[in-house]
């Protein structure tokens, strides 16, 4: 910690804040940076730190937190710079750090198109990923004890040879064990001094040929390398030496790669350490629900709902305090343990936090001034719960403060003038406040001397404040009230505790009349303040209720507007879909007609002749039914029924009514091969005497239709779309033909056709009911459809 005297930092417990932030760090280097935090005096520098901090806070809220955990690898890199060989553990540490750099870069990718993370983007630019070096280490070093076979072709070949010789040795030893069990203590293979041996009984030492490498503690067992594997063991040992030499060569090469990238690694370490420090501040800010302070250099402090960050959040009482505009000196009076010292420490600590680029636990838009120095007299190494100050230690400290203070200082004095005779102490306190007031610095002092209350009332630029005390509960509320001096409350407290009224009245007689009147005035002002505050709170409550109601009404209005827009939009979309579907259906029909015609051309002559004959008959029928001789048309019809012939005005064509008009006046009409819906206003009916002739023509048409309609339709093997087209046409024809019941054969299969057809039938206005076939009708492979009567 630097930038402020140590006594101030400790008295205000800033060192504890630093430790809490350090606990949020992931790396040792990040913690080092926290403990090296600086209390800055330059406004731009502090604003920059706060900008950076609040980008980190926003990043955590937007994208989640990042871990910056890594070990300090700087010493490893320095060793590589002087051509030392780095071994597995050191290289793995470097590899892990380089992986972290890549992870951080990946986290910051989401910021590339964001304009509100400019400072974090600069960190991203400073980070240099060393992917090639990371992959080389990754492909070489498997663990702290193992190098990969793939590290080099030479190493791979050596290890292959080793494996082969190991197999030979074990095979030979297994053969010895199986044939000479009597001479062995146990049928096992073990190792001594890097060579394969077997445990031989002492009495067979001269019989069992080989080299003795060890013996048991009792001497009963000798560990002998059989003569048959001595050469193989020698060869294995040579390969192990070659392997070690190759590994050292590989590690040296990797160390040289680290050396080449040393500067980039050092820079990355610095950037990641800074980020760890920054995100630790951000985590702490989120944890204490802090906000960014507004800074100034005019000496103005205005804290709203400020909380001391070291007090339990469940117990801390937020305070509102301001100084530096209407007054530059604030005298806080009130009972001991009432929260006066906490108020001093809160102002001082939050000022230091802001100057260190740390968010403060207060409401947004709280204001903090940047001071050249912060002077504190709150006892020697005092904590909030404990006071060890004496008059002499107070005065020594105050003398030092008075020598150094200037107009750009913040001075915090606890229990000014305490520890000596009250008359002399209060006189000294007023004189010290006079001196500080003349320098123009910002001073907050606490006291329980009533003389200082009167001094504050009489002196321009000096203001009283008090810590509220609840006489009912005999407890301080810890709320700070600016503008009203505190009362001792001694008489009220004594009365509540049971002291007789006689003694209390007698005590008052020892006080001067002026002192009693002063206390009564304070009491009266305090009561009126409480009444006003209660009234204000009621007004605020009502205002909030009105705001809530207003917001609810606005929300309801927006909801209705949104629903209106949504309904209109959905209607337009539905219309577009209907038009699109109609076009697609028309195109599909045209396509099918063309395909059918194309197929017709390829049929033999006999079918062609039949087709021509049918066509001729249909044309004659159409001429007779749908295109009769010129008739005179009357007015728009009042009502229509199925079977009537009508003139369709927009098409200049006759058509047959398929169903009566619906509630909206829309009529379903058949014109040639096309079926359409037309509004009744676009239809005309024939004269009465000619209508009968048309009806006869229509009847002949229906009779012809009935003859050609089969009582069943087979759609097996078709796709659902094709089947639905066939079913729709079939149902229309069957209804026109006057059939009461038809059968649709769809087969069992997967059930897709059955389900799709059932859905269509459910929505068809011609269908009265439908069901699956019963036994003897085709079962669930068919659907029996009952049609409405025409």
From Swiss-Prot:
Single Gene Ontology BP annotation: negative regulation of DNA recombination
Protein name: Endonuclease MutS2
Top EC class of this enzyme: hydrolase
Originating species: Caldanaerobacter subterraneus subsp. tengcongensis (strain DSM 15242 / JCM 11007 / NBRC 100824 / MB4) (Thermoanaerobacter tengcongensis)
Pfam families xref list: MSSS, MutS_V, Smr
Encoding gene, per UniProt annotation: mutS2
Binding sites annotated in the UniProt record for ATP: 334-341
Record keywords, A-Z: ATP-binding, DNA-binding, Endonuclease, Hydrolase, Nuclease, Nucleotide-binding, RNA-binding, rRNA-binding
GO molecular function, one term: mismatched DNA binding
Known role: Endonuclease that is involved in the suppression of homologous recombination and thus may have a key role in the control of bacterial genetic diversity. Acts as a ribosome collision sensor, splitting the ribosome into its 2 subunits. Detects stalled/collided 70S ribosomes which it binds and splits by an ATP-hydrolysis driven conformational change. Acts upstream of the ribosome quality control system (RQC), a ribosome-associated complex that mediates the extraction of incompletely synthesized nascent chains from stalled ribosomes and their subsequent degradation. Probably generates substrates for RQC.
Subunit structure: Homodimer. Binds to stalled ribosomes, contacting rRNA.
PROSITE patterns: DNA_MISMATCH_REPAIR_2, SMR
PANTHER family: OS10G0509000 PROTEIN, OS10G0509000 PROTEIN-RELATED
Taxonomy of the source species: Bacteria, Bacillati, Bacillota, Clostridia, Thermoanaerobacterales
UniProt domain Smr: residue ranges: 713-788
Entries under InterPro entries matching the protein: DNA_mismatch_repair_MutS_C, DNA_mismatch_repair_MutS_core, DNA_mismatch_repair_MutS_sf, MSSS, MutS, MutS2, P-loop_NTPase, Smr_dom
EC number: 3.1.-.-, 3.6.4.-
Presence of the UniProt keyword rRNA-binding in the record: yes
Family from the record: Belongs to the DNA mismatch repair MutS family. MutS2 subfamily.
């Amino acid at each position: 910690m630097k930038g402020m005297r140590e006594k101030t930092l400790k008295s205000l417990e800033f060192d504890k804040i630093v430790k809490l932030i350090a606990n949020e760090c992931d790396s040792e280097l990040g913690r080092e940076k926290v403990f090296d935090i600086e209390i800055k005096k330059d406004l731009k520098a502090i604003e920059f730190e706060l900008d950076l901090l609040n980008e980190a806070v926003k990043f955590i809220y937007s994208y989640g937190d990042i871990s910056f955990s890594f070990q300090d690898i700087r010493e490893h890199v320095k060793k590589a710079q002087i051509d030392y060989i780095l071994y597995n553990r050191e290289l793995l540490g470097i590899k892990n750090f380089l992986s972290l750099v890549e992870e951080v870069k990946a986290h910051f990718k989401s910021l590339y198109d964001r304009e509100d993370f400019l400072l974090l983007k600069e960190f991203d630019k400073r980070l240099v990923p060393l992917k090639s070096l990371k992959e080389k280490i990754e492909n070489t070093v498997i663990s702290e004890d193992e190098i990969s076979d793939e590290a080099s072709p030479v190493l791979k070949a050596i290890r292959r040879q080793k494996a082969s010789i190991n197999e030979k040795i074990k095979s030979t030893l297994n053969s010895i064990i199986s044939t000479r069990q009597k001479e062995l203590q146990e049928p096992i293979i073990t190792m001594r001094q890097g060579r394969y041996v077997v445990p031989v009984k002492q009495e067979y030492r001269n019989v069992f040929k080989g080299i003795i490498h060890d013996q048991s503690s009792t001497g009963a067992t000798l560990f002998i390398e059989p003569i048959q594997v001595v050469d193989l063991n020698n060869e294995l040992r040579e390969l192990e030496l070659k392997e070690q030499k190759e590994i050292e060569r590989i590690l040296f090469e990797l160390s040289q790669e680290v050396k080449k990238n040393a500067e980039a690694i050092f820079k990355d370490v610095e950037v990641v350490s800074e980020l760890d420090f920054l995100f630790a501040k951000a985590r702490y800010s989120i944890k204490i629900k802090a906000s960014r302070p507004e800074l100034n250099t005019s000496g103005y402090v205005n804290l709203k709902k400020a909380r001391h960050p070291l007090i339990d959040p469940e117990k801390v009482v937020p305070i509102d305090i301001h100084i530096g505009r209407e007054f530059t000196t604030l005298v806080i009076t009130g009972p001991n343990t009432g929260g006066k010292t906490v108020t001093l420490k809160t102002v001082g600590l939050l000022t230091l936090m802001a100057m260190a680029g740390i968010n403060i636990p207060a409401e947004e838009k709280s204001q903090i001034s940047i001071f050249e120095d912060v002077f504190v007299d709150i006892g020697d190494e005092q904590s909030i719960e404990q006071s060890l100050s004496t008059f002499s230690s107070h005065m020594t400290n105050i003398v030092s403060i008075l020598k150094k203070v200037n107009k750009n200082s913040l001075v915090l004095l606890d229990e000014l003038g305490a520890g000596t005779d009250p008359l002399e102490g209060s006189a000294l306190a007023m004189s010290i406040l006079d001196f500080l007031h003349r320098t123009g610095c910002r001073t907050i002092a606490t006291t329980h001397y009533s003389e200082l209350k009167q001094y504050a009332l009489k002196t321009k630029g000096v203001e009283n404040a008090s810590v509220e005390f609840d006489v009912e509960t005999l407890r301080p509320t810890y709320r700070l009230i600016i503008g009203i001096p505190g009362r001792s409350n001694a008489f009220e407290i004594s009365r509540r505790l049971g002291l007789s009224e006689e003694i209390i009245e007698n005590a008052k007689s020892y006080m001067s009349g002026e002192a009693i009147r002063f206390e009564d005035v304070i009491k009266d002002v305090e009561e009126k303040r409480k009444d006003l505050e209660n009234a204000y709170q009621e007004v605020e409550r009502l205002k909030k209720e009105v705001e809530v109601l207003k917001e609810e009404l606005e929300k309801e209005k927006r909801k209705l507007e949104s629903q209106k827009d949504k309904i209109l939009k959905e209607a337009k979309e539905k219309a577009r879909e209907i038009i699109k579907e109609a076009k697609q259906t028309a195109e599909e029909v045209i396509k099918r007609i063309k395909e059918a015609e194309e197929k017709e051309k390829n049929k033999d002559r006999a079918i062609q002749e039949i087709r021509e004959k049918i066509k001729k008959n249909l044309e004659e029928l159409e001429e007779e039914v749908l295109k009769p001789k010129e008739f005179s048309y009357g007015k728009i019809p009042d009502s229509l029924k199925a079977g009537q012939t009508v003139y369709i005005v927009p098409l200049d064509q006759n058509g047959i009514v398929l169903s009566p008009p619906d509630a909206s006046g829309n009529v379903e009409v058949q014109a040639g091969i096309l079926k359409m819906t037309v509004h009744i206003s676009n239809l005309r009916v024939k004269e009465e005497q000619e209508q009968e002739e048309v009806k006869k023509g229509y009847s002949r048409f229906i009779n012809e239709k009935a003859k050609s309609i089969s009582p069943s339709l087979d759609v097996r093997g078709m796709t659902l779309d094709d089947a639905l087209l066939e079913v729709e046409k079939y149902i229309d024809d069957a209804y026109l033909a006057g059939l009461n019941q038809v059968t649709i054969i769809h087969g069992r299969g997967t059930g897709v056709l059955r389900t799709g057809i059932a859905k269509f039938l459910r929505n068809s206005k011609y269908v009265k009911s439908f069901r699956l076939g019963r036994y003897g009708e085709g079962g669930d492979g068919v659907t029996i459809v009952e049609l409405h009567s025409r």
